[in-house]
């Protein structure tokens, strides 16, 4: 990325974090319109890396929306997949309720577990 961005656009930097485009919302709709959704998903699934599972953000962080609703991750938030069966506000949460709670997953989760993994801090392994 650093080489291409410098060559094409003259952009120079010390650090670059890249995250996988999740096949949800606008990007998912774009892929579907172009007939590329299944190919993209197959690529993510075929590159699943079990070593990424301990480092995915949903294992240690939650996402809170502007109304105080709790989600396992930013992507679940965009899909309105609440952490609990019923929406819960952060001010109603007893923190211990999160310990051992199941993480809601979907096909989009392969985006964080493909290859070297993906998170806001960069690759996972």
Region annotations inferred by a language model:
Residues 70-125:
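Flexible mid-to-C-terminal extensions adjoining Fe-S/redox cofactors in radical SAM and related proteins
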Residues 3-5, 38-41, 59, 84-86, ...:
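Short, surface-exposed linear patches
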Residues 2, 46-48, 61, 95-98:
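Residue-level detector of functional hotspots within protein domains
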Residues 1-54:
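Radical SAM enzyme [4Fe-4S]-AdoMet core and its adjacent flexible, acidic
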Residues 15, 61, 108-111:
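Generic structural signal for residues positioned in beta-strands
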Residues 25, 56-58, 81, 123:
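Generic hydrophobic/packing signal
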Residues 45-76:
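C-terminal accessory regions of radical SAM enzymes
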Residues 19-21, 65, 115:
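Structured loops at beta-to-helix junctions and adjacent beta-edge loops in soluble globular domains
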